[in-house]
Amino acid sequence: ASIMATDYTDGLALKAMKNIFTYLPAAYENGPHDAKAREQMATASTMAGMAFANAFLGVCHSIAHKLGAFHHLPHGIANAILITDVMRFNAAEVPAKMGTFSQYAYPHCKERYLECANFLGIQGKNDDEKFENFLTAIEELKAKVGIKKTIKDYGVDEKYFLDTLDDMVEQAFDDQCTGANPRYPLMREIKEMYLKAYYGK
């Protein structure tokens, strides 16, 4: 959903996503005993890397970078914890109008997420339901591979997390990935996402 995405990067990202949904559970469960699943995950990783090397990333990675730097949370786990909440943030119908990307009246991110859902064959009676079903599918995939629900579940100390929160927020706001996010976040919105990811819903 990066504002730098193109048809070229979209094709790579969509195929990588489909491989992940198809093969990650088997690669996780069967390890070295399922060479096909591991091969396809390696392919997905490479294709995703080619996509984001050209289209950049977004605020999910910005927030995750600081969780790694301050709290040593592995980057993939940090992104997995955050992803659906960031998607909800990005898909807001009428977010605050930002002057940074004046070519957009408002972000069109929900349409991009629905394109992803369509590519995976996820259905819904309307766009809102399809989007929610897509988020549910992501949460189910996370559960299959042992991703815990919150930052707190990974043993990050609450006091130290809160003590470092403002620094993480400022650094995430300034992170190079934030500028490519389809909805430009306010610092208080980044803070809300951190707190939600720490404590859960």
What are these regions (language model features)?
Residues F70-L73, I77-Y160:
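Gly/Pro-rich interdomain helix-loop hinge
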Residues Y8, K36, E129, K152-G155, ...:
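Short coil/turn segments at secondary-structure boundaries
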Residues Y160-K201:
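Short, amphipathic C-terminal "tail helix"
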